[in-house]
Amino acid sequence: MFQLVYLSRETEPFTPEALRSLLAHARRNNAALGITGMLLYRDGHFLQALEGDETTVRSLCAKISRDSRHSQVTYLFEENIEEREFADWSMGFHDEIGRAHV
């Protein structure tokens, strides 16, 4: 099991609708890929933890790095883990308004 945490900055402001769409898309795709994690969004920044098969997680992170909605993608840490920290979350989410969506 592998976990990667990154920080990125939005290139244009996300509307609440765009954030909901992004989250729905991430949840569908992550579930299909066997990836779990969480996403925080605040003041134009994303902090995301992804966990799953190392090759799959790295491939998804490379795709996110190429996504025109993200800039300044910085990997904060990458490590092998014994077990998932977000096992029940296809993608937990917390926005700048202070609402959690698990």
What are these regions (language model features)?
Residues 1-99:
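Charge-rich, low-complexity N-terminal segments
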